[in-house]
Amino acid sequence: MKQRDRQILQIALPSIVSNITVPLLGLVDMAIVGHMGGAHYIGAVAVGSMIFNMIYWVFAFLRMGTSGMTSQALGRRDLPEVVRLLVRSLTVALLISLAILLLQVPIAWLAFSLMSPTAEILPFALRYFYICIWGAPAMLGLYGLTGWYIGMQNTRLPMFISIMQNVVNIAMSCLLVYCFGMKVEGVAIGTVVAQWAGFLVGLFLLKRNYWRMAKYFQRPGIFLRSAMVRFFSVNRDIFLRTLCLVAVNMYFTSAGAQQGAVILAVNTLLMQLFLLFSYVMDGFAYAGEAMAGKYYGAGNMVALRDTVWRVFRWGGMMALLFTIVYIQGGSDFLSLLTDEQSVVAASAEYLPWAVLIPFAGLAAFVWDGIFIGLTATRSMLMSLVFSALAFFAICFTLVPFFGNHALWLALVVYVIVRGLVLTVAAHKKIKKA
């Protein structure tokens, strides 16, 4: 195995373990609420989770921007800037999370107005929301920490944090639901406790592993106007890109919710397959962004191009593996998540769409990582603009006639267009560099 392949795996494998715990966390929550005795419990957690995904996705630049800029600064050996980037990211995360807590009531009103859940789902989703909102400071702070760790080529610490979070979440959720008889509230409290545990452990690991970096701390340079302008200019396109991403995901869930609790539950279960693949692929994307940013910062374009090729090769093998697994065992996997027979039966009809996701989304997932490392955020934004336009065009024209099948078609086309646009942009930025 080539040295660069080993470097990719050293970053990717801990990231895969770390990232796969995210959909596993959702799967555990779905498995718990899926056995509570009604599809409306699944729908409530689905709607509540989607709202928080939207909130956190909007501020995903705290991870992505920090990772790209940190890896480039590391490649330049600008260690004082590496430290300043961490402080900037955590400070911005704190300010944003405080704003979210202060505005939680209008945020809830707006989010649930846009999602339009059924009257059966709404009260349970509201309970979930007003508990989970208190995990926002921990989640956004952990975004900043994780991005910095990835930029430092260290994915082992995020892996440890994610595993610990899931152990805490599973233990707390099971304790509160099965021992204390709580329903959606128990799942929500378990999530918040796990989020804060993860952030606090992340700070402890930062002090333990990077205390020597403190000597590069230079307070006067942290909040210089030029530094903050660059920080936000790099993240501006990521922010706008994320709004497009949120709009697509929000509409997908909302369109499913408007078709009833069963279809919403079906789409939620199938999306777990989508998320499972995406988080595994993000492991290689993280390797791409960390290494691409480092080589780009060092001006080593030969190593950069070789890294891109090798990351795509590993990603292709993973896409093939997931396609085979979903074809052979997708139905059995869904049956493990719920004992609601109406949901299980309906899921079989739409499973083929989930099978298409691995190869349809391969290019989009890998290029996202590479472009984050290069901080080529404008291309990332344009890929989401074009793909979102394609998604909504299909939804508005075909969903009224073909229902949920058209909704899934729109999602598949959406990820394909993302990959195509980024491939064209990469040809201009990387191959001609």
How should each PLM-predicted stretch be described?
Residues 6, 21-22, 59, 100, ...:
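Alpha-helical transmembrane segments of multi-pass membrane transport proteins
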Residues 5-7, 11-12, 22, 41, ...:
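Hydrophobic alpha-helical transmembrane segments of integral membrane proteins
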Residues 10-29, 131, 142, 151, ...:
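Transmembrane helical elements of multi-pass membrane transporters/channels
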Residues 1-15, 70-137, 179-239, 292-357, ...:
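Short alpha-helical transmembrane segments in multi-pass integral membrane proteins
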Residues 24-43, 112-119, 175-182, 239, ...:
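Helix-terminus/linker motif at the lipid-water interface of multi-pass membrane proteins
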Residues 42-102, 139-157, 266-328, 362-375, ...:
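Small-residue-rich hydrophobic transmembrane alpha-helices
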Residues 63, 131-151, 158-169, 187-202, ...:
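Short runs within selected transmembrane alpha-helices of multi-pass transporters and secretion channels
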Residues 27-31, 144-148, 170-175, 203, ...:
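Alpha-helical transmembrane segments of multipass membrane proteins
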